[in-house]
């Protein structure tokens, strides 16, 4: 133990938090989570240990602007101004200091290893009692599972130690400091330390004791570490559980270790041995270690599909069987290896359906509770994810246990990111920073290596490629050859990675950046001498209304075996709850706390909102990642299973044939598909209706029984095929009524019964409609070529940093948002049975014509208005966001009914999960409440729309809500939106894709851009 004076003044003078060579003082060695059971049955059943005591709860708390402001008296007693906070928590979530959101830029002046003198510091204290039996014998430890960013610890006024690395435990021996009766802990936490330079992750920068604190009592002679691994024969019919156990304390000949393996109540294998390991070199072996090997016949293998778990109990006892203590862990028999360019699990090539996950809670910041962790896992499993990357740091210890038990593959990532350094590898190539990096990697491995869910180690994120990475790669490969190592920095394919793991590489498009090119994922595989698998560590940036083009990735993954999937960025929006002056909650992002620097809404990239409500994009991910694929040939459906290990045993295939959403025939077939197998399903003779309409066959895979992660009736996969469309000439109902045209200087007015249409001759637009004496429009029906910018449209543009290549800047520069309509033509003609209005407009900005729109409106005796639109786009203007019409309807109806793709929001490059049917939803559900308002709620492939008294027919896309595109464009947060009068309707003949390969460069694929130059569409507007 390092002995240092207890004085606060000495600690402050020494400034351990500005010395990269000091990462800890008196911290105990890393190991898997311990409980020190004194009963092996309790260890086997994972019951709460009497030797493990939580210190979570209310602590005394005082905040200071700098460590030098902390009074020395605090070491002995609480300060008069001390408040109370709950531990674990981030102090910023309790109103002390401000959270800072920044992506790349360091929130402090970059001068490593030094940090600002204004370094917010919080002083925590807790008074507690210790069992007298703990004081009489053994060792009492205190465990801090996570403290950000560095801290000093005192007990009863005496200095205990120092720790940093906010995402791994710091554990100290308190035995020499405790006394009978009351004891007092004092913890001084600093916001910034030299460790902050290694923690430049894209997340909120928060501080405090934000993970659990506990006391653990272990015997004097104790298990100090244990490591389990599984080995197999070629066909996995026989396995060996290898358990290496290490002890500390007084080594005696009578000490024994027993390792027993359990499957539920059944003991599968057991072995006992004294300490004394195998001969290592000419000086002998480890006297304090022993390795036991247990043979297991026909083990039930672990995978994310079937997470079979055993329980290993490690007992330290005397030769006569007297138990000293027991530790235990779950064991999954599984093998991970790379062979022939493929990442294999239990001999089968994996397809990673992955997502990156930050630890984030909208109310609690970076404090994770079991309920939230389980909620995340259930949602991931329900949406066909099988893998998660701990971005970008080791997670709460419970997370790994839950992933073991529910079944998720985990990339465990070291808490290292130096994204804001120039160059990025300035620290990671510096040997002075090797000790700090080494602790972050080695301690992660030592804590988490017993978890079967951890299949890949990661050296960190966005830190360039330095010599320190190479050294740590070699250390991991030496200590744990059972797992691959990945690392993206320095180009994604350096010597420090077993897997090509790029971020945001595109399917077919090269991004030839200097020094670190991002080749298309297809090209990367074919580079000379490259034999590694490719798994995208980040892709499909799900910021706001995004995930366009996701299907292209999955087509490539299924086409090329060495493209083994990737991890979507990312799981959850990192918005935080604030309250307005009336106490109403609202969602905040970067800058909303007065934090500078900040990266605005870039913290919200999730497939789910911060409260875990899904984004519409999550359904697209679920569909593309589904484990059943379908092919229709004639009346035969071929069902292919992409499960590697699971035989379908809880699936029914429901099929239905519908004409324009009206069911004509349906059936149900049990699925009986072997892993990677096929099943052919013969359908009966399908109906061939004579009436006009679209005929669709829909199949859905339903789980009739509940599972550990889903309720009964869960739909896991689906597919649709359009069978036919019977055409017919729609004749208007026989009517002797003829619309009457009245012409005035200002207007053309058409009347038919109780309906009237008014066209303004000065503007050329349909300016009003009446049904009886009720006006139907609040604004004219006008052309629309713009949208409220998406995050993907904005890219990195902001007021102080304009990116001229961003879509929104191109549209602004070209005048799309400012364009005015110049009337070229507005005429009216009376036909034999209808009135025809013909208009033409030139949409201009600063004298330049951007679009020419020609329209005809044919109003017939049935009251239908058939609208035909032809648009020409100037060849030298940017491709528009949309080509459509919009108006503000006077009505506010409760529900929206449509025949088309749904039910969720969908866009041209994100619609494979949508199904053609007749849908009916509340008006409020047609709006997607993205925290940063933008274009939203589109439904594509629409043949009919019904709202209030109105009906529209054709082939179009629409969105409908209480918010105008203008308001969405001008409003910074969703809670600031106000419902406008009436309802805004946007009907598009064509709409540009939304993109999503990344969110900082134009990423809409060419086939989803509006580049044709000429466009034609039609629709019919009538009243029901």
Curated annotation (Swiss-Prot):
Bound cofactor: record note: Binds 2 magnesium ions per monomer.
Residue ranges that the Swiss-Prot or TrEMBL entry lists as coiled coil: none
InterPro entries assigned to the protein according to its UniProt record, in alphabetical order: B-gal_small/dom_5 (IPR004199), Bact_Beta-galactosidase (IPR050347), Beta-gal/glucu_dom_sf (IPR036156), Gal_mutarotase_sf_dom (IPR011013), Galactose-bd-like_sf (IPR008979), GH-type_carb-bd (IPR014718), Glyco_hydro_2 (IPR006101), Glyco_hydro_2_AS (IPR023232)
EC number(s) recorded for this UniProt protein: 3.2.1.23
Residue numbers binding Na(+): 202, 602, 605
Cofactors, names only: Mg(2+); Na(+)
Gene Ontology biological process terms from the UniProt entry: lactose catabolic process
Keyword match Metal-binding: yes
Annotated positions binding Mg(2+) 2: 598
Site features described as Transition state stabilizer, chain residue numbers: 358, 392
Binding site for Mg(2+) 1: 417, 419, 462
Reaction equations catalysed: Hydrolysis of terminal non-reducing beta-D-galactose residues in beta-D-galactosides
UniProt entry keywords in alphabetical sequence: Glycosidase, Hydrolase, Magnesium, Metal-binding, Sodium
Catalytic residues identified in the record: 462 (proton donor), 538 (nucleophile)
GO MF assignments: beta-galactosidase activity; carbohydrate binding; magnesium ion binding
Enzyme class: hydrolase
Binding site for substrate: 103, 202, 462, 538-541, 605, 1000
Cellular component GO terms held in the UniProt record: beta-galactosidase complex
Subunit-level organization: Homotetramer.
PANTHER family in alphabetical order: BETA-GALACTOSIDASE
Family to which this protein belongs: Belongs to the glycosyl hydrolase 2 family.
Name of the protein: Beta-galactosidase
Organism field: Escherichia coli (strain ATCC 8739 / DSM 1576 / NBRC 3972 / NCIMB 8545 / WDCM 00012 / Crooks)
């Amino acid at each position: 133990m390092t002995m240092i004076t207890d004085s606060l003044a000495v600690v402050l003078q020494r400034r351990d938090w500005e010395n990269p060579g000091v990462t800890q003082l008196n911290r105990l060695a890393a190991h898997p989570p311990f409980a020190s059971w004194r009963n092996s049955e309790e260890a086997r059943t994972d019951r709460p240990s009497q030797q493990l005591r939580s210190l979570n709860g209310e602590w005394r708390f005082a905040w200071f602007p700098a460590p030098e402001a902390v009074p020395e008296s605090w070491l002995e007693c609480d300060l008069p101004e001390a408040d109370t906070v709950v531990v674990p928590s981030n102090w910023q979530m309790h109103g002390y200091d401000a959270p800072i959101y920044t992506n790349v830029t360091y929130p402090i002046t970059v001068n490593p290893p030094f940090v600002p003198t204004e370094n917010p510091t919080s002083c925590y204290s807790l008074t507690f009692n210790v069992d007298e039996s703990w004081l009489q014998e053994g060792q009492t430890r205190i465990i801090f599972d996570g403290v950000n960013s560095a801290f000093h610890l005192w007990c009863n006024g005496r200095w205990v130690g120092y720790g940093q690395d906010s995402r791994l435990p710091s554990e100290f021996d308190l035995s020499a400091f405790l006394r009978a009766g009351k004891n007092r802990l004092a913890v001084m936490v600093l916001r910034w330390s030299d460790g902050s330079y290694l923690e430049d992750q894209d997340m909120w920068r928060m501080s405090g004791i934000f993970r659990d604190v506990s006391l653990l009592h272990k015997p004097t002679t104790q298990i100090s570490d244990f490591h389990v691994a599984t080995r197999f024969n070629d066909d996995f019919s026989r396995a060996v559980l290898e358990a290496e156990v290490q002890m500390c304390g007084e080594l005696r000949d009578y000490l024994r270790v027993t390792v027993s393996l359990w499957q539920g109540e059944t003991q599968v294998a057991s072995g006992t041995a004294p300490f004394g390991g195998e001969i290592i070199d000419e000086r002998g072996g480890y006297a304090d270690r022993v390795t036991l090997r247990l043979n297991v016949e026909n083990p039930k293998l672990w995978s994310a599909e079937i997470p079979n778990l055993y329980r290993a109990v490690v007992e330290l006892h005397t030769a006569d069987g007297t138990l000293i203590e027991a530790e235990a862990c779950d064991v999954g028999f599984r093998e991970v290896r790379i062979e022939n360019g493929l990442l294999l699990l239990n001999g089968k090539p994996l397809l990673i359906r992955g997502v990156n996950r930050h630890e984030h809670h909208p109310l609690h910041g970076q404090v994770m509770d079991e309920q939230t962790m389980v909620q995340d896992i259930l949602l991931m499993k329900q949406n066909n994810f099988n893998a998660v990357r701990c971005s970008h740091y080791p997670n709460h210890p419970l997370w790994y246990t839950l992933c073991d038990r529910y079944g998720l593959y985990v990339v465990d990532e070291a808490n290292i990111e130096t994204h804001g350094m120039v160059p990025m590898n300035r620290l990671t190539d510096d040997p002075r920073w090797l000790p700090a990096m080494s602790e972050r990697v080695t301690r992660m491995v030592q804590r988490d290596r017993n978890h079967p869910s951890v299949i890949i180690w990661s050296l960190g994120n966005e830190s360039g490629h330095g010599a320190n990475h190479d050294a740590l790669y070699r250390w991991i490969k030496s200590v744990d050859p059972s797992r691959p190592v990945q690392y993206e920095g320095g180009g994604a394919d350096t010597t420090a990675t077993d897997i090509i793991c790029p971020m945001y590489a595109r399917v077919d498009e090269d991004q030839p950046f200097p020094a670190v090119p991002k080749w298309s994922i297809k090209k990367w595989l074919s580079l000379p001498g490259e034999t590694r698998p490719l798994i995208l560590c980040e892709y499909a940036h799900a910021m706001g209304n995004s995930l366009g083009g996701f299907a292209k990735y999955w087509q490539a993954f299924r086409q090329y075996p060495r493209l083994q999937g990737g991890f979507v960025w990312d799981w959850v929006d990192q918005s935080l709850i604030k309250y307005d002056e009336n106490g109403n909650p609202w969602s905040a992002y970067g800058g909303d706390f007065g934090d500078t620097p900040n990266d605005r809404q870039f913290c919200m990239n999730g497939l789910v909102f911060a409260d875990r409500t899904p984004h519409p994009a999550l359904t697209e991910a679920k569909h593309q990642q589904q484990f059943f694929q379908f092919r229709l040939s004639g009346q035969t459906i071929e069902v292919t299973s992409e499960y590697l290990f699971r035989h379908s045993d809880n699936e029914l295939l429901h099929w239905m044939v519908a004409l324009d959403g009206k069911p004509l025939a349906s059936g149900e077939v049990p699925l009986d598909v072997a892993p990677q197998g096929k099943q052919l399903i013969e359908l009966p003779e399908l109906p061939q209706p004579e009436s006009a309409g679209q005929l669709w066959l829909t199949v859905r895979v339903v789980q009739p029984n509940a599972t550990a992660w889903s309720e009964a009736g869960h739909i896991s996969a689906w597919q649709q095929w359009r069978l036919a469309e019977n055409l017919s000439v729609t004749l208007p109902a026989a009517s002797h009524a003829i619309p009457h045209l009245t012409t005035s200087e200002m207007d053309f007015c058409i009347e038919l019964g109780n309906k009237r249409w008014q066209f303004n001759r000065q503007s050329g637009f349909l300016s009003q409609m009446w049904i009886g004496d009720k006006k139907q429009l609040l604004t004219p029906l006008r052309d629309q070529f713009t949208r409220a910018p998406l995050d993907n449209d904005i890219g990195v543009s902001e007021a102080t940093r304009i990116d001229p290549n961003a879509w929104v800047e191109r549209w602004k520069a070209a005048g799309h948002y400012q364009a005015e309509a110049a009337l070229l033509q507005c005429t009216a003609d009376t036909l034999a049975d209808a009135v025809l209005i013909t208009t033409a407009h030139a949409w201009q900005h600063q004298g330049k014509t951007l679009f020419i729109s020609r329209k005809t409106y044919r109003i017939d005796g049935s009251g239908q208005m058939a609208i035909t639109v032809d648009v020409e786009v100037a060849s030298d203007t940017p491709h528009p966001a949309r080509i459509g019409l919009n108006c503000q309807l006077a009505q506010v109806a409760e529900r929206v009914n449509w025949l088309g793709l749904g039910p969720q929001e969908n866009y041209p490059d994100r619609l494979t999960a949508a199904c053609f049917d007749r849908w009916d939803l509340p008006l409020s559900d047609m709006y997607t409440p993205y925290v940063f308002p933008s274009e939203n709620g589109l439904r594509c492939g629409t043949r009919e729309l019904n709202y209030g008294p109105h009906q529209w027919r054709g082939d179009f896309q629409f969105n409908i809500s209480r918010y105008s595109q203008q308001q969405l464009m001008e409003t910074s947060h969703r809670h600031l939106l106000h419902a406008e009068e009436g309802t805004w309707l946007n009907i598009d003949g064509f709409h540009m894709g939304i993109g999503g390969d990344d969110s900082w460069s134009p990423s809409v694929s060419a086939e989803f851009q509006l580049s044709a130059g000429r466009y034609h569409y039609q629709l019919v507007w009538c009243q029901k």
